[in-house]
């Protein structure tokens, strides 16, 4: 009987190794399919939507394979179905849990487009369309939202950022920057309107009695950072006096503000 040579032994060894790898892979897949199934779905960070709404929007359910879900697809589905969600982070926790961390976008303003009114967040993303006068969604009070004036809009698709008409892109950018700065300073609830019709004369209504004149967009952050202490001083010196707060001369090196009673 012939004895296998080294080359034949090497081929036999390689075959056994390959077979072993295949068996291990199949065992791992089988084990994952049988044991790594979703038993619990936890939702964190939601206040505008119920846990059931987020779970339904995710498309996940108990019994699905934990490792066969696509986190990016799940996140996209949630953001498409629930416009007030700006981000959804999907985490797997062995052996059987999925955690969905939701970040919501608070409503900030209202814009008019094609005879309808749309709710937007501080980044200019459209959250909802207002239907009729008796609008109610997630406890929103329409009168508490900022009216955006002087912006020509080309598209207002729910879940997407506003698109300005050709030539009005700068106005849209001005609005986004102002809203973002207001959100940082926490003053959005105190603002009644923002007028972006003139990029050299940006202004907004504040606390119901003041018109805050920003002028150009330059030094916007500095202007809004000094607004609250400026108003506190004005209230002390001119109680209950409406007027214009001119911040056009505020820069990163000076906080020169003028108040003109009206």
Language-model features: where?
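Charged, solvent-exposed interaction patches on well-folded alpha/beta domains
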Residues: 2-32, 36, 53, 57, ...
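Extended, alpha-helix-rich binding/interface surfaces that flank or overlap catalytic cores
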Residues: 43
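Short extracytoplasmic
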Residues: 49-76, 80
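Extracytoplasmic/periplasmic mature domains of Sec-exported, cell-envelope-associated bacterial proteins
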Residues: 71, 75, 81-89, 97-99
């Amino acid at each position: 009987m012939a004895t296998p040579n080294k080359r034949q032994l090497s081929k036999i060894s390689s075959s056994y190794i390959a077979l072993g790898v295949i068996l291990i892979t199949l065992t791992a897949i089988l084990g994952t399919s049988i044991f790594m199934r979703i038993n619990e779905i936890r939702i964190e960070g939601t206040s505008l939507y119920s846990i059931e709404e987020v779970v339904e929007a995710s498309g996940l359910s108990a019994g699905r394979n934990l490792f066969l879900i696509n986190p990016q697809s799940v996140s996209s589905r949630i953001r498409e179905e629930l416009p007030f969600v700006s981000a959804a982070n999907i985490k797997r926790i062995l052996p059987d849990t999925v955690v969905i961390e939701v970040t919501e976008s608070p409503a900030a303003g209202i814009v008019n487009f094609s005879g309808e009114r749309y709710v937007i967040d501080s980044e200019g993303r459209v959250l909802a369309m207002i239907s009729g006068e008796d609008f109610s969604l997630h406890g929103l009070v329409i009168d508490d939202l900022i009216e955006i004036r002087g912006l020509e809009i080309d598209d207002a698709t729910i879940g997407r950022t506003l698109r300005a008409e050709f030539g009005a892109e700068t106005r849209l950018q001005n609005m986004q920057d102002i809203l973002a700065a207001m959100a940082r300073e926490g003053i959005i609830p105190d603002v009644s309107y923002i007028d972006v019709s003139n990029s050299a004369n940006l202004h907004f209504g504040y606390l119901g009695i003041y018109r805050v004149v920003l002028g150009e967009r330059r030094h916007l952050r500095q202007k809004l950072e000094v607004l609250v202490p400026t108003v506190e001083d004005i209230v002390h010196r001119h109680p209950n006096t409406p007027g214009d707060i001119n911040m056009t001369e505020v820069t990163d090196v000076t906080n020169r503000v003028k108040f003109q009673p009206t």
